[in-house]
Amino acid sequence: MLNSIVHKFQYGQHTVVLNTGAIARQANAAVMVSIGDTTVLVTVVSSNQEKIDQGFFPLVVHYQERTYAAGKFPGGFFRREGRPSESEILTSRLIDRPIRPLFPKGFLNDIQIIATVVSVNPQIHPDIVAMIGVSAALSLSDIPFFGPIGAARVGYIKDQYILNPTTIELSNSKLDLVVAGTDSNILMVESAACVLSEQEMLNAIVFGHEQQQTVIQNINQLVKKAGKVKYDWKLKDMDILLSEYLSNLYRSRVNVSCLVGVNKKDRQEQLNNIKHDIIDITLREYNENIDVNEVMSFLNNLEIKLLRSSILRDNVRFDGRSPDMIREIDISAGILPRTHGSALFTRGDTQALVTATLGTERDAQNLDELTGDRVDRFLLHYNFPPYCTGEIGIVGAPRRREIGHGRLAKRGMLAVMPNSNEFPYTVRVVSEVTESNGSSSMASICGASLALMDAGVPIKESVAGVAMGLIKENSNFIILSDIISDEDHIGDMDFKVSGTRTGITALQMDIKIKGITYDIIEVSFKKARCALLRILDIMDQVIKIPRKDISEFAPRIYSIKINPDKIKDVIGKGGSVIRALTEKTSTIIDIEDDGVIKVISLNAEKAKQAVDRIQEITANIAIGSIYTGRVTHIVDFGAFVTLFAGKEGLVHISQITEKRVNRVSDYLKLGQEVLVKVLEIDRQGRMRLSMRGINHI
């Protein structure tokens, strides 16, 4: 009989159910976690073998959604789930980031975490459910892990913070923030905001962290009932004499002050040459009786320690900047003649070539997600080719990092984008990172803001982005503005923030140590605000407001509203009217059920002709008014004249002219255009027309 252990607790407006012991028993740990009807199965498996020659922690997180969870079939020919969607990749990264710092330093065993969504309530997004499940599974397992962590989504509606808002609540929220942390520290923040103040953002982080303590406490209770004993793992200590020898040798050869102002490539080359020389000397000294990988790891850690100490002690960074100084910025807008909008944003050795393309509703992305279908009118894609770091690499489909950075840049711009009523275009922004030395995603946000303005997109305000770093030793810490890649590598925090002059639009914070306090976050916000304002000042010197008109190469979209009852008149019998209109004017015409008609053309004059014709077709015929019509039938007692949209009326033989008419054909021919006056419209809509006194016949 399966031994299932179930633990339930209240978390905000929802009940969380943790179930372990009955499913996936071959894994190191497995948890089935449910909130409402959203259920995720989380498994954790660790290898027994250490990858000693690997320079990074081999942790892999797979978040996967099964369509059966929502009672759906997968799309495509094979009717089977394929490669992960963008949403699945982003959630995998969301889970990975807060747990990675909580494994022991030097732990190099393979760990694979799989979170599978097996049931979904469209009102409860599975990401928070999966994060709670991963925290519980790692805590229950025998794998060394300094958790558990909690996770919370925070909304902001009517000046009130909402814990884990539903999908409907989130659509009305000014904030979508996910925060994860331990019982005492914050580890990760991911958010998009509708231009909120730094204090509002900080309060949201504090609120989410306080609320998630319930999760941590209840996971600890479950561990007491069902947790495994952690297996004994300790970092192998290097021989004391060897470590002292290496330390003295390295310190004697490295002068950190001589590295200040040296470019990234030369600095890394100097440091690598020193390390390889030390390894060669050590091999001779110890008769090759040493582990080269162990020595290199020791030297790398020593290098980081020396570089960190230098910044803390001297307040001088690798490139000679003070802690609060941003790099030199160079901006050009409108540099690509045939794109709808473009900008080149360069900050130090980081550069992004950003373009904006305008399209129609037909270009929008239709997303079939577990929580429901939706249409995305704003796309932002981030490309990071290998040449941007002077390397040779694989070129192909976007990797996880590119997808994550693109989504962050998109979050940064969403708050200032116009709605479909203000600007009826689908917009695609592409950032080509042409040089990279830190903060390329933030450069992409700056470039996106500039390119959108160059394209004439009426964004509400300019948006800039900056990455802040942290060096922390015990209670002593320093915040660095606009960090470069080496500072990111040796630092304890990556704090990326974007915003306008009035507030924050996006925040992504990742901590590499076991957490930071609210005070550090508050200082980071204040310094980021100063940096953003300086960057915005420089951007505004190039382009401050959107251009008044869109590119001559962009499609023109004209929108009009008609009575829905007249849609059939615009379409015509079998589509005859709209087909003839589109062919004559070379336009695309989209008609909505509510009577909104969009006319699309690369030629503004042609589009105007189509709009005028639609307005003519849908106009109400007024008694006493004069219209142009075409003779369509001739009979003994008169002629039938079609006005527009197939509206036909009779001109009686007595109403053709003031003279006596014996034969209608003596005065009128089929296809002849004539002016007619509407005399009467009966209840059935039949019109009585007159040509008398109007036409020269």
From Swiss-Prot:
One Pfam family from the record: PNPase
Residue ranges occupied by any KH domain in the UniProt entry: 555-614
Xref: InterPro entries: ExoRNase_PH_dom1, ExoRNase_PH_dom2, ExoRNase_PH_dom2_sf, KH_dom, KH_dom_type_1, KH_dom_type_1_sf, NA-bd_OB-fold, PNPase
Gene designation: pnp
MF annotations from Gene Ontology: 3'-5'-RNA exonuclease activity; magnesium ion binding; polyribonucleotide nucleotidyltransferase activity; RNA binding
UniProt keyword Cell membrane present: no
Cofactor: Mg(2+)
Protein origin, superkingdom: Bacteria
Source species: Blochmanniella floridana
UniProt-annotated binding residues for Mg(2+): D488, D494
Cysteines paired by S-S bonds: none
EC number: 2.7.7.8
The protein's role, per its UniProt record: Involved in mRNA degradation. Catalyzes the phosphorolysis of single-stranded polyribonucleotides processively in the 3'- to 5'-direction.
Enzyme's top EC category: transferase
Localization: Cytoplasm
CC annotations in GO: cytosol
Catalytic function, reaction form: RNA(n+1) + phosphate = RNA(n) + a ribonucleoside 5'-diphosphate
Keyword Phosphoprotein: no
Keywords: Cytoplasm, Magnesium, Metal-binding, Nucleotidyltransferase, RNA-binding, Transferase
Domain (S1 motif): residue spans on this chain: 624-692
Family (UniProt): Belongs to the polyribonucleotide nucleotidyltransferase family.
NCBIfam families cross-referenced by the UniProt entry: polynuc_phos, PRK11824.1
Name of the protein: Polyribonucleotide nucleotidyltransferase
Assembly behavior: Component of the RNA degradosome, which is a multiprotein complex involved in RNA processing and mRNA degradation.
Record GO biological process: mRNA catabolic process; RNA processing
